[in-house]
């Protein structure tokens, strides 16, 4: 299912009051964006790696963000990463939706109870993570295009010095 359709269904579920179902959709979207952000620049400068664990992906994204010299992006990533770590932590964190309980079917009533406010916080987390992933992917595409056209530019400048 395309990401925008999954997002629309998540919003529709929240509007209809089906918060737990909406949150399940949002967890899939969060994982997708986290993987997309971690895969930026893979195979361009260094050998392509596969990041299976969330902590490995977070460390890769952290490394990318810190290399960009963009204060806003560093601040945004720091806040998003801290909240995302709470959401996906092994042990439940007070006041944060516990992903593992909902996704893996832990039917402890307290852990799977989702309210509108918590679902809205998860949407905002996804939107910000999407913004970061798109930013990294756009930068990657610019670098990829630059590397594609660089040899012809060098030859042109060599043949036509100004």
Language model: regions and residue ranges:
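Short, flexible/disordered secondary-structure transition segments
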Residues: 21, 40-41, 109-113
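Charged alpha-helical initiation segments
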Residues: 1-20
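Short, flexible loop/turn elements at secondary-structure junctions
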Residues: 14, 18, 27, 31-34, ...
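Residue-level detector of well-ordered alpha-helical segments, enriched
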Residues: 21-26, 98
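Short non-catalytic regulatory patches outside canonical folded cores
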Residues: 24-83
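Acidic, Ser/Thr-rich low-complexity intrinsically disordered segments
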Residues: 151-162
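Amphipathic, non-membrane alpha-helical segments in soluble helical-bundle scaffolds
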Residues: 19-23, 89-92
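Charge-enriched, short contiguous segments at helix-coil
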Residues: 81-151
